[in-house]
Swiss-Prot record:
The keyword Membrane applies. GO terms for biological process: axonogenesis; brain morphogenesis; cell migration; cell-cell adhesion; dendrite morphogenesis; regulation of synapse structural plasticity. Residues 840-850 have a biased composition (Basic residues). Belongs to the vinculin/alpha-catenin family. It is found in: Cell membrane; Cytoplasm; Cytoplasm, Cytoskeleton; Cell junction, Adherens junction. Keywords: Cell adhesion, Cell junction, Cell membrane, Cell projection, Cytoplasm, Cytoskeleton, Developmental protein, Differentiation, Membrane, Nucleus. This is Catenin alpha-2. GO terms for cellular component: adherens junction; axon; catenin complex; cytoplasm; cytoskeleton; nucleus. One of its GO terms (molecular function) is cadherin binding. It comes from Danio rerio.
Length: 865
């Protein structure tokens, strides 16, 4: 296929906008002949060719009109059938229609007065515009045909990596279709401007690489390093994961000379990476100090761990001090991870704020024709782009989300290559500020840049947690509020305006991201609470803050400065911080104590990407920004109904488990705790099949299944300990049988967790199906839930058996403690509301005076009965 592709590439000459297929060339030839015949005159002198009889001008004009109408009809049909380039084709058809009408009027006027040079010039310009519009329509139609063929070829590919490459190549062709036209047109119109050639060559190279990628993926000949150039989790995250695995050693085979240098070398490599992040310009001083402190703590924990290994050398079992040292080591590496994530989020929060400002400033300078300013702002724009790429790579370095890291790196590569071309488009516009072609070229590159920045932002958001984002945003807004107050007191209008704009941008980003996050959950008390906090911030707090900023700037800008209420501004600023803090508190409401660490951060190791948006590369619609969960939500109604039936059956089983665990106090009873955890995770997995819940991608579901398997293993260990102490053989056998069911159903759930909606393109229509995989997942979860219920009951029965036999000695040291859950406490006396106590006045009853003798006599009388 490669040999067949090369001649096509060589025949495609962007200078003349020559199309790439003979079929389209034959379609264009009649119109070119008719138009050129109409506009040609004898100005070039007498011809040596044999004279003949030319058609009348009116006849040629009608022929041009008919040919144009034919293109319009075909173009409208192609636009109607196209899925990928519908909007571009519709715009191209309308352009041909407009230029055709202009040509019809101009040719008619010229035919009536063929001696008029003015009318002839008007017609020549109209003819050129018509040919340009028709050529663009044919290029787009050709591209649509190529993409349609590629879609069918992509379905036939078996290797997922090849399908991904094919999808990426299709996306590149679609992206570069319009850019190819505008860049080539700008180069043709302004060949003396060097930047136009750079733009044209860049787009042409992108198309060449896309076609080469199609050839490679179709033949599965992509080089290994090219296939996996962006694959793998972050380097720092991988090093930390490997270090955590390496610290688990067997004391029996431990050798200090062998293991100490290796572990210390690995740790120093990790600390070097952490130090680079700490020394970065966007890292706050307090964050830098925390990272340094955590690095020192990890060093010390490693030395303590190695000392314990030396003390336990030659032993078969690990002692409690050694286990404690391992736990401490793991905790310290986890703390270091948290600080590194926070440092990365510092960078993201600062760099991905108002990402379009450098571009807009560059374009405004280009429109004014000031090439010197354009070069100055181009440097600022280049630094901004480099910062985005740098921060994106930092985010990748600490992420465990392999799929997300791949997408971020691909998006960052696109940003890096597109940046110089945006500058070239601006230089072209600065050199020819009155040129509509240069302006159109700038607009296309501007749109492409903004789209790529959005993709990069969403991809970076996808590998960071919402909780880290909220924590850092809260701190940054507090910093900016303090800066605003200081600038206000010092009368620094520029700093006040700039910092207030940053506060508005941060608050708007919080609102946008948390609104998107709440779409992952079913409506309920939790989502209502969060959405109320968001509404309060966006509709009440921020308008008041903006109003106070405007008043303050207006008062300080006058000469002399006018007095104003400083306290009003401070109160409005404080409310912004309080509003973001309230949103964070509302989001953290459903976190478990294990998830809420020292600074209320959600420690997310397996779920490193439970967040806003997801961009997949498995299907074209996923590239457009839809997650696997969103695709599940697009299943046909018949499949949704069947899934709903399965979910209802699962809920009935869940209610049984809820009723069982609700009876017991989970303090000292890890079996109940594990049952609750497994129930919660299984509920999230079933929600995924309906396009709901926090799980977004197949990797999230797989990680959830792993968590359930881990919980099942821990429950198996506890329940077997209960069974070992049970003297009743029947109860013991029942409990062990239920444990075998848990192991089986955990394995089934792990297999079914690969649930994924299948998307097929049949006849240009996307067909989404996923009933079998979804129902299998729900059924496996239902079976596991039933096994957990039976295990909890059997564990309690077995515990009662061995307590009866062994007496109080067993009761005092059980494997788990079975205590009935205490009822909720209720006040014995109804408490009055404070406002009622203040307003209600009651008349006290008259106090009765009873003599002691009378009371004693009554007491004796009652005693006599």
């Amino acid at each position: 296929m490669t040999s067949a592709t090369s001649p096509i590439l060589l025949k495609w000459d962007p200078k003349s906008l020559e199309i790439r297929t003979l079929t389209v060339e034959r379609l264009l030839e009649p119109l070119v002949t008719q138009v050129t015949t109409l506009v040609n005159t004898s100005n070039k002198g007498p011809s040596s060719k044999k004279k003949g009889r030319s058609k009348k001008a009116h006849v040629l004009a009608v022929s041009v009109e008919q040919a144009t109408q034919n293109f319009l009809e075909k173009g409208e049909q192609i636009a109607k059938d196209s899925q990928d380039l519908k909007e571009e084709l519709i715009a191209a058809v309308e352009d041909v229609r407009k230029q055709g009408d202009t040509m019809r009027v101009a040719s008619s006027e010229f035919a009536d007065d063929p001696c008029s040079s003015v009318k002839r010039g008007t017609m020549v310009r109209a003819a050129r515009a018509l040919l340009s519009a028709v050529t663009r329509l044919l290029i787009l139609a050709d591209m649509a045909d190529v993409m349609r063929l590629l879609a069918h070829l992509k379905i036939e590919l078996k290797d997922p990596q090849c399908r991904d490459e094919m999808a990426a190549a299709r996306g590149a062709l679609k992206k570069n279709a319009t850019m190819l036209y505008t860049a080539s047109q700008a180069f043709l119109r302004h060949p003396d401007v060097a930047a136009t050639r750079a733009n044209r060559d860049y787009v042409f190279k992108q198309v060449q690489e896309a076609i080469g990628g199609i050839s490679s993926s179709a033949q599965a000949t992509s080089p290994t390093d090219e296939k996996h150039g962006h694959a793998g989790i972050g380097e720092l995250a991988a090093a930390l994961n490997e270090f955590d695995n390496k610290i688990i050693l067997d004391p029996l085979t431990f050798s200090e000379a062998r293991f100490r240098p290796s572990l210390e070398e690995r740790l120093e490599s990790i600390i070097s990476g952490a130090a680079l992040m700490a020394d970065s310009s966007c890292t706050r001083d307090d964050r830098r100090e925390r990272i340094v402190a955590e690095c020192n703590a990890v060093r010390q924990a490693l030395q303590d761990l190695l000392s314990e290994y030396m003390n336990n050398t030659g032993r078969k079992e690990k002692g409690d001090p050694l286990n404690s040292a391992i736990d401490k080591m793991t905790k310290k590496t986890r703390d270091l991870r948290r600080q590194l994530r926070k440092a990365v989020m510092d960078h993201i929060s600062d760099s991905f704020l108002e990402t379009n400002v450098p571009l807009l400033v560059l374009i405004e300078a280009a429109k004014s024709g000031n090439e010197k300013e354009v070069k100055e702002y181009a440097q600022v724009f280049r630094e901004h782009a480099n910062k985005l790429v740098e921060v994106a790579n930092l985010a990748c370095s600490i992420s465990n989300n392999e799929e997300g890291v791949k997408l971020v790196r691909m998006a960052a590569t696109q940003i890096d290559s597109l940046c110089p071309q945006v500058i070239n488009a601006a230089l072209t516009l600065a050199a020819r500020p009155q040129s509509k072609v240069a302006q159109d070229n700038m607009d296309v590159f501007k749109d492409q840049w903004e789209k790529q920045v959005r993709i990069l932002t969403e991809a970076v958001d996808d590998i960071t947690s919402v909780d880290d984002f909220l924590s850092v945003s809260e701190n940054h807004i507090l910093e900016d509020v303090n800066k605003c107050v200081i600038a206000l007191q010092e009368g620094d209008v520029d700093t006040l305006d700039r910092t207030a704009g940053a506060i508005r941008g941060r608050a708007a980003r919080v609102v946008h991201i948390i609104n998107a996050e709440m779409e992952n959950y079913e409506p309920g008390v939790y989502t209502e609470r969060v959405l109320e906090s968001i509404k309060l911030l966006s509709e009440t707090v921020m308008p008041r803050f903006a109003e106070q900023v405007e008043v303050a700037i207006e008062a300080l800008s006058t000469s002399p400065p006018q007095p104003f209420e400083e306290n009003e501004f401070i109160d409005a600023s404080r409310l912004v911080y309080d509003g973001v803090r309230d949103i964070r508190k509302a989001v953290l409401m459903i976190r478990t104590p294990e998830e809420l660490e020292d600074d209320s951060d959600f420690e997310q190791e397996d779920y490193d990407a439970r967040s806003r948006t997801s961009i997949q590369t498995e299907d074209d619609q996923l590239i457009a920004g839809q997650s696997a969960r969103a695709i599940m939500a697009q299943l046909p109604q018949e499949e949704k109904a069947k899934i709903a039936e399965q979910v209802e059956s699962f809920r009935q089983e869940k209610s049984k488990l809820d009723a069982e665990v609700a009876k017991w106090d989970d303090n000292g009873n890890d079996i109940i705790v594990l049952a609750k955890q497994m129930c919660m995770i299984m509920m999230e997995m079933t929600d995924f099949t309906r396009g709901k819940g926090p799980l977004k991608n197949s990797s999230d579901v797989i990680n959830a299944a792993k968590k359930i398997a881990e919980a099942g293993s821990r429950m198996d260990k506890l329940a077997r300990a209960v069974a070992d102490q049970c003297p009743d053989s029947a109860c013991k056998q029942d409990l062990l049988a239920y444990l075998q069911r848990i192991a089986l159903y955990c394995h089934q759930l792990n297999i079914c967790s690969k649930v994924k909606a299948e998307v097929q393109n049949l006849g240009g229509e996307l067909i989404v199906s996923g009933l079998d995989s979804a129902t299998s997942l729900i059924q496996a979860a239902k079976n596991l839930m039933n096994a957990v219920v039976l295990t909890v009951k059997a564990s309690y029965v077995a515990s009662t058996k061995y307590q009866k036999v062994y007496g109080t000695a067993a009761v005092n040291s059980p494997v788990v403690s079975w205590r009935m859950k205490a009822p909720e406490k209720k006040p014995l006396v109804k408490r009055e509301k404070p406002e009622e106590c203040q307003t209600r006045v009651r008349r006290g009853s008259q106090k009765k005076h009873i003599s002691p003798v009378q009371a004693l006599s009554e007491f004796k009388a009652m005693d006599s009965f």
